[in-house]
């Protein structure tokens, strides 16, 4: 990791990138992830499941075919299938880093099978026209289904539609500008704190110059955001800020907090010093194995 990556310029990098898959591949490389030769791969469906789906599309009788909740009239966006096939995809090779469950093919909300917990897009949302289809097609969920992520059925024909997140059982919020950006954002949330050097900063600790509110203010003033929508999960909204080889995760809500993750221990310690946090290398969590 001799070359320093300035995540303070990440928002500009997003704007300049021709597509999100290039940035996703680079991000994997920057944090030291590589698919292990011969490792198992999570396929989006088995051969039998795919055959069942194709038969259902052709109009053959559907009797307990395992596709409850799937609207066969809706296409699956190209970006979702592309993500499953990415050769460098850390989710499909090491899903333990993510603590989420994929849903494939996507199922609609409200879910006619009764399995999905969220409802349709709320009536007062301006994310679609008043007379548009307000169903949401869910393709990913938090392990306990506390949050679900999906795209609007009204946008299912788009190759890379916007992604919404369920913030409670009857409300959805915008999570990402596209499916491909969602997966980049999910990786940013997961890999650095697993494969990098990290530290959780807790309010009330004497290591902070001032209190947590002072630290939040310094981060906001001195570090640029990465350019994503706030990450909504488990009743927290997390904004990620960038610096040289380092990220700061700032979450609000009842379970909110602050965390640093760096490609090197020096990057985390330098950030801590700039922000008035007293840390030593012994305070850092070392990168995990995969």
Predicted regions mapped to residue ranges:
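Hydrophobic beta-strand residues in large extracellular and virion-surface proteins
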Residues: 80-83, 163, 248, 258-260
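A surface-exposed partner-binding patch
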Residues: 1-158, 193-202, 220, 225, ...
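Extended, charged low-complexity segments
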Residues: 233-290
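Signature of lipid phosphatidyltransferase scaffolds
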Residues: 170-197
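Short amphipathic beta-strand/extended segments with alternating polar/hydrophobic composition
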Residues: 149-153, 173-179, 270
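Intrinsically disordered, low-complexity regulatory segments enriched in Ser/Thr/Pro
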Residues: 151-154, 158-167, 254-263
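Short Lys/Arg-enriched alpha/beta "domain-start" segment
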Residues: 187, 192-233
């Amino acid at each position: 990791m001799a070359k320093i990556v300035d995540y303070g310029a990440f928002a500009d990098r997003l704007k300049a990138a021709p597509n999100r898959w290039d940035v996703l591949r680079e991000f994997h490389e920057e944090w030291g992830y590589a698919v292990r030769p011969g490792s198992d791969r999570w396929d989006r469906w088995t051969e039998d499941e795919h055959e069942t789906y194709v038969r259902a599309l052709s109009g053959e009788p559907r009797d307990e075919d395992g596709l409850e909740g799937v609207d066969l009239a809706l296409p699956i966006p190209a970006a979702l299938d592309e993500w499953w096939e990415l050769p460098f995809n850390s989710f499909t090779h090491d899903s333990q880093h993510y603590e989420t469950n994929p849903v494939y093919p996507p199922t609609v909300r409200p879910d006619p099978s009764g399995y999905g917990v969220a409802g349709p897009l709320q009536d007062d949302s301006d994310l679609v026209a008043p007379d548009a289809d307000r169903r949401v097609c869910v393709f990913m969920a938090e392990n306990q289904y506390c949050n679900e992520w999906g795209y609007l059925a009204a946008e299912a024909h788009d190759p890379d539609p916007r992604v919404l997140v369920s913030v409670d059982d009857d409300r959805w919020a915008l999570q990402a500008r596209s499916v491909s950006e969602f997966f980049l954002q999910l990786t940013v949330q997961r890999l650095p704190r697993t494969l990098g050097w990290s530290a959780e900063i807790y309010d009330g600790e004497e290591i902070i110059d001032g209190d947590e509110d002072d630290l939040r203010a310094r981060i906001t003033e001195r570090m640029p955001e990465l350019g994503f929508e706030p990450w909504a999960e488990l009743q927290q909204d997390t904004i990620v800020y960038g610096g040289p080889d380092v990220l700061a995760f700032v979450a609000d809500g009842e379970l909110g907090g602050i965390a640093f993750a760096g490609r090197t221990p020096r990057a985390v310690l330098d950030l801590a010093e700039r922000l008035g946090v007293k840390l030593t290398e012994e305070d850092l969590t070392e990168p995990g194995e995969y």
